[in-house]
């Protein structure tokens, strides 16, 4: 798993593209502002705003309505350059995360 500083570099101030981990279908793009605010733009349309932060080697998010407005913590497993698999704190697989829409680095991991 990525360590605290690596998680911050992967998330803070970036646009992160989220994909279904099985189908690799684009699901959403999340902008993580340097001020702790985030905005998700869903592939199916619509947006939701929220906040995010860091806790140990993890990061957390809480949106107004997405995921029932609840706070969720995630760990990141690196899979390739600019690509990581997110896991909920309980170990359940979450979105595949990437710094671009291009997932070709997965085949080089």
Mark where each language-model region is:
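Lipid interaction determinants
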Residues: 1-51, 60-109
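Cysteine-nucleophile amide-bond enzymes
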Residues: 54-56
């Amino acid at each position: 798993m990525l360590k605290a500083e690596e998680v911050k570099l992967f998330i803070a101030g970036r646009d992160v593209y989220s994909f279904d981990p099985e189908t690799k279908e684009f699901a959403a793009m999340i902008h993580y502002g340097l001020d702790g605010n985030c905005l998700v733009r869903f592939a199916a349309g619509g947006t939701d705003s929220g906040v995010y932060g860091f806790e140990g080697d993890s990061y957390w998010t809480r949106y107004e309505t997405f995921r029932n407005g609840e706070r969720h913590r995630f760990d990141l497993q690196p899979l390739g350059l600019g690509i990581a698999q997110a896991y909920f704190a309980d170990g359940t697989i979450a979105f595949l995360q990437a710094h671009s829409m291009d997932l070709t680095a997965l085949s080089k991991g």
